[in-house]
Amino acid sequence: NMLLTMVSDDSGSEGDKVIEKQYISSMFGNVKSNDLKTLKGYIDKNYDLIKNDVSTIKYSYNVEPLIYTKDVTNKITKINPSEFFSSFGASSMYSFSSVFNQMIDDISSLEKDYNVLAGSWPKNYNEMVIVLSSKNTISDLLVYSLGLRDSSELNNMIKDIMAGKEVNIKNDPMEFTYEDLMNVKLKLVNPSDMYKYNSKFKVYEDLSEDSDYVKKIYDNAEELKIVGVVAPNSSNSSMSLMAGVAYPSSLTKHIIDLASESEIV
């Protein structure tokens, strides 16, 4: 994810402090009115640069975890699959806004390329690690995606861009400890739970826009734990993990198992 990996310098913070780099904000702030073509071209160009640079082959079932969190305003928010940039209508935009990625199973290989800054690598299907592009920096996209900023701010930026308005962002960079990042609460939702059978019409209704229903599902959903924070070491040339949040293949298997038990597949 280029919007996560372009943040690579360690300036401005030391120790276990992680400072937010406002890459998204500055990119949007530099887009002229009605200049969507330039913005989309920029992202498409950079996407092409990195998509061929993935050196680790992994097999995927094309299954994505449905993940919710409560953001800083206490609003229950879907953070994966990401809906940021969906209004642009481009698959490459989605690739750039996607924060959650399945990691390779070979932990010993990852240990050679990454430093564990806090916590540990996942040992169970419901455990994840935050992958920083460098030990003391975090992209504002990841900050928004983890609910550490009000997600409506980013949505409003995107709406302004789409409406041809200039974006004015006046946020000061945030600073976090590794513990702050590991304390983010995530919930795994079974997609079929977002549907409820309507006996009158004999159909399953999608209730994902019903806030009361979503709250009930969220409250009863299983928790995902962020058990570690990692960053590439100086000798890392493989970049086998994308910056963002990495989860084990066992989570994918768990999701498939849940789907197989559901009445709706």
Model-derived features: positions:
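Basic-flanked hydrophobic alpha-helices used for secretion and membrane insertion
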Residues: 1-265
